[in-house]
Amino acid sequence: MNLTQEDEQRLALLRERAAAWDHKNALGEFESNAELDVYNEGIAYPPSIDEMEVGEGRPTLDKILESSIGSDSLPNLEDGPPDQEAAYHEGEMYSTMMTSYMDQDNENMDLSAGPTCSTPQPITGIHHKETINGRVTQMVYIGETSDMALINRLQDEFDVLYNTYPNRNKQGEIVHLIVMWSTPLKPSTRYSLSPAQPPGKKRKIVQHSSNPEPEIVFVPEPTSSEQSLPERQIKAYLQRGIELKGKSAEVPNFKITNETLGFSDANLKLLYPDTSLYPDNPVFILEDVFASTRQLNKIKVNYQLYDPVLPSI
């Protein structure tokens, strides 16, 4: 039997309605006979339950309920239906609580009082504004993280935004957003990436003090007394959290540790261990960025050590 376009549309509507009521047997019968039960409204409806021939093996509502008796997923209705009034007041109380929570001022909001989830969410906020090389920059603090790949992706997006649809502050100045973060080992210290450099030059990590004026960070040159200290004391001196930045330098008895980099153990996959100097306490070297003379008491630290794009091994 050839169906007209109108009949095909009605059949499609019938399929949707039949699927909604889960009348698969009825739908199969309609398609095989190519018959449409069209009412006065011109819409095809599935037949009533009395008109349908349901197979013996087809699950019915009674069978479903019988198999679910005692299930923890169903409410216990032996003592009567749930108290609708109590449920209403409980929902109203929750709604009021959430509305009150969301209406709080952002600065006074207690983030620990809100809903929680298993995956920590970074709390972003404007840290401070400064002018770098004539460009107004706005630091956006994203909280504690050791994921340099995430930081680079965010900064790349901010750079694209600045070059395509730049933001303007209340004074009408074009603002370049800069990612700012802290590390789990140094939660009170703020870091940011230097703005996009000309071709051939790489970004550096900038450390900020709480002022938050930028702080000069450099590789310290040990004094003569420090150079003569026993190896263990020199090692402790280096593990206080010295940040490495600036031009390359040769420092006696110097080894780069995870603490001096300010990263957590989550970033060890980006480094490889070296036990040549301290077999019982391996240090981690940046591959392809760290240049070593492989001499016992002299390690050459390349300024590219602070390039945020760390190699993956």
Swiss-Prot record:
GO cellular component terms attached to this protein's record: host cell cytoplasm; virion component
Major localisation: virion
Cell compartment(s), UniProt: Virion; Host cytoplasm
Presence of the UniProt keyword Phosphoprotein in the record: yes
Residue stretches spanning the membrane: none
Keywords: Chaperone, Host cytoplasm, Phosphoprotein, Viral RNA replication, Viral transcription, Virion
GO biological process, one term: viral transcription
Positions of disulphide bridges: none
PTM field: Phosphorylated by host kinases. Phosphorylation play an important role in facilitating trimerization and possibly P-L complex formation.
Region spans: Disordered: 189-208
Quaternary structure note: Homotrimer. This trimer is stabilized by binding to the L protein. Binds N(0), and N in ribonucleocapsid.
UniProt function note: Essential component of the RNA polymerase transcription and replication complex. Binds the viral ribonucleocapsid and positions the L polymerase on the template. May act as a chaperone for newly synthesized free N protein, so-called N(0). Plays a role in virion assembly.
Protein name (Swiss-Prot/TrEMBL): Phosphoprotein
Source species of the chain: Drosophila melanogaster sigma virus (isolate Drosophila/USA/AP30/2005) (DMelSV)
